[in-house]
Structure formats: structure tokens, C-alpha cells
């Protein structure tokens, strides 16, 4: 997802982004979370082609292959788990560095994924998706998870804060939420420096 609708488009996209200095990409086996996933052999071909491209450029691009088996609308939880494991191992064999399975939050399920997939496992830390809350970082570490992604969580939290500030300003004419967020002052100063640095970057 995000790189093109066919192999040629995907390779063309990756060719363009490697020179920017990136160290890795995320590639998904669904399109717009369609309940019908991309055929696993076709997806493996995409991974292998990306790996061959990065190798030909003398650069090891980290490929984080995401399977959306748990998003599919059909099948039991066990069937989705089995498909995630099967796809994860296939993607690893095709050249992926790590496997991203989401949304999962049950400790037993996560432990099974770590045990059965022969690759570092990536979990989404985002309680806004699904019915459960992802275990803490220390708990995920104990389960053997190698990488935690915040996904769109940071942006959603930022937009929610902006909405709260705007509502207070509109309804009460006060700035308490904004001022509380910018306290202590050193944090506010650091945030300003980060913002101006991003603005001035090429």
C-alpha cells in the first residue's frame, strides 16, 4: 500500500525514495484495508523485487512487511492467526526484514506470533483501533516484540488536542489547555525549535 498498484509502479516509487536518505519502508498486503488481501505469492514477488533493487544499489533497505490478516472480515480468530503466521514466514523468505501484524493486543496472540514467525515482530501501539489496549512497552519487550509502531496515533492525539484548544477558545475565550500543554517552559521552547527546524529544512 502506498507505493503503487502494480510491481512496476512500486519499484519506480522505491527507486525515487531511496536517494532521499530513508533507511526503511513499510509495505502492506491490503489496499485501503480491503477484506480481500493481495495474493501472497504476488506480494512476495513485490518484496523480492524491492530487495533485489536495494541490493543492486548497494544499500540494505529495511523492509517492514505488514499483513492485514486480522483486518479481514471472514474467518475465525484462529484462522486469521494462522494466515498471519503463514504470510509472515513467506514474506520473510521473500526478503522482508521484519513482519508487522495488526491490530493485535492479546498477549497470548502476540506471543504466538513471536514464536511462530521466523522474523522480528512489529506491533501497533494504538488503543484507538480495535476493542483492546496494546500491552505496555515493557510487556511487549517481555513477549519478544522487536518493534513498536505508533501508526497514526501521534497525529490523532495532536489533532484531538488542537480541537480541545479550539473549543475552549471558542466557547470560553480562555487558553488554559494551551497554556497547560506548554508548561514547563523548556518543553515549549524545545517544541518551537523543532518546528522552526522542520520549516527551514530543504
Regions found by a protein language model. Give the residues of each.
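Alpha/beta enzyme core
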Residues: 1-150, 157, 167-168, 197-201
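Extended, intrinsically disordered, low-complexity segments
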Residues: 151-202
Amino acid at each position: 500500500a502506498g507505493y503503487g498498484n502494480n510491481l512496476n509502479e512500486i519499484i519506480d516509487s522505491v527507486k525515487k525514495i531511496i536517494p532521499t536518505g530513508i533507511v526503511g519502508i513499510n509495505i502492506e498486503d491490503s489496499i485501503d484495508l480491503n477484506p480481500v488481501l493481495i495474493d501472497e505469492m504476488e506480494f512476495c514477488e513485490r518484496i523480492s523485487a524491492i530487495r533485489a533493487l536495494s541490493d543492486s544499489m548497494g544499500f540494505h533497505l529495511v523492509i517492514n512487511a505488514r499483513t492485514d490478516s486480522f483486518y479481514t472480515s471472514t474467518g475465525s480468530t484462529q484462522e486469521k492467526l494462522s494466515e498471519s503466521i503463514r504470510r509472515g514466514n513467506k514474506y520473510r523468505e521473500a526478503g522482508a526484514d521484519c513482519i508487522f501484524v495488526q491490530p493485535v493486543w492479546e498477549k497470548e496472540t502476540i506471543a504466538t506470533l513471536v514464536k511462530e514467525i521466523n522474523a522480528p515482530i512489529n506491533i501497533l501501539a494504538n488503543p484507538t483501533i480495535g476493542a483492546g489496549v496494546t500491552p505496555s512497552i515493557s510487556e511487549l519487550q517481555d513477549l519478544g516484540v522487536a518493534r513498536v509502531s505508533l501508526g497514526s496515533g501521534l497525529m490523532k492525539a495532536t489533532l484531538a488536542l488542537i480541537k480541545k484548544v479550539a473549543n475552549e477558545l471558542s466557547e470560553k475565550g480562555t487558553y488554559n489547555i494551551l497554556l497547560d500543554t506548554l508548561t514547563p517552559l523548556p518543553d515549549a521552547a524545545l517544541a518551537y525549535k523543532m518546528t522552526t527546524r522542520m520549516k527551514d529544512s530543504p
